[in-house]
Amino acid sequence: MAESFEKKRPVLAVVGPTATGKTALGVALAEQFGGEIISADSMQIYKGLDIGTAKVTPEETHGIPHHAVDLLEPDQTFSVADFTALAGTLETDLSARGKLPILVGGTGLYVQSFLYGVRFTAEKAPDGLREQLAAELAEKGPAALYEELKQVDPEAAAAIHPNNQVRVL
């Protein structure tokens, strides 16, 4: 289900809601520290969704490369597992070229899974499992479900706070 890893290279992150100045700050940091941007926005990966996502314009980039933008058609799927794999590849490449990876975006699950070491696989849960676990959560409470997670996947449990019911589920 999840695999954890240890970050060994520096990565900056600029996170927050849409249209709050993340792009401008990310570009300024990239200019100052020799970095490139990795978009952590679940919608900017798609071509043609420029307005609703406040997608960076060519002028706003100031020539700083922006990765993970306009890669897919809107009818293609892209999961957190896909993002962490792509961001990991980009981080390795940028670091090898002496560039500072700067994660910029507002998709919290993308940011958390990448920065805090939980890598999700693309495996689909068996039919009905999520509903079964949600019922168990309602019946037994979050502590019991977290204890079950510790038994099934100790690495994932170590990377997830016991009170984060969404991630525990």
Please give the residue ranges for each predicted region.
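Phosphate/pyrophosphate-binding catalytic cores of soluble transferases and nucleic-acid-acting enzymes
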Residues: 1-169
